[in-house]
Design a protein with these regions (language model features):
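Short, structured helix-loop boundary elements
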Residues: 10, 51, 79-82, 97, ...
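Short, Lys/Arg-enriched N-terminal segment that forms or immediately precedes the first helix
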Residues: 1-10
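N-terminal helix-turn-helix DNA-binding core of bacterial DNA-binding proteins
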Residues: 9-53
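Amphipathic alpha-helical dimerization/coiled-coil segments
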Residues: 88-119
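Basic amphipathic alpha-helical segments that dock to polyanions
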Residues: 54-61
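Beta-hairpin "wing" of winged helix-turn-helix
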Residues: 62-78, 84
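A cross-family signal for key residues in well-ordered alpha-helices
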Residues: 23, 37, 59, 94, ...
Length: 119
């Protein structure tokens, strides 16, 4: 990867990793490395989830009952833990999306305020 690509990378906002993991698993079961790669690919290489954040996040979501994990064999013929979204995880993703939309709207109002007529 070129230095230019690294310069384009964006830091994940606090609290967005769970939403991104849940959304990625909405497309189907995936192992941890695949989840990180999917987030990176879907963001056009702008988001990179570090292993030190991804796996604790997966374990946290599994503990909350939003993910279910099972051992399987990866495309590289390696043993891997596959995660899938549960019904509770789907409901949580819906809540996270609603909150995200509200946050984006609120930030947009601050960044692009309506004209007030004041100079």
């Amino acid at each position: 990867m070129s230095k230019n690509s690294d310069d384009r990378r964006l830091e994940l906002l606090q609290g967005t990793l769970d939403m991104l993991i849940l959304r990625t698993l909405q497309w189907g079961p995936q192992h941890g490395h695949g989840i990180g790669q999917a987030i990176r690919a879907q963001s056009d290489d702008l988001l990179k989830v570090e292993t030190g954040s991804l796996y604790p996040g997966l374990h946290r979501l599994e503990k909350r009952g939003w993910l279910k994990a099972e051992w399987g064999v990866s495309e590289a013929n390696q043993r891997a833990k596959y995660y899938r979204l549960t019904a509770a995880g789907k409901a949580q993703l819906s809540r996270e999306r609603d909150r995200w939309s509200q946050l984006v709207d609120a930030i947009g109002r601050v960044m692009n305020p309506a004209p007030t007529g004041k100079g």
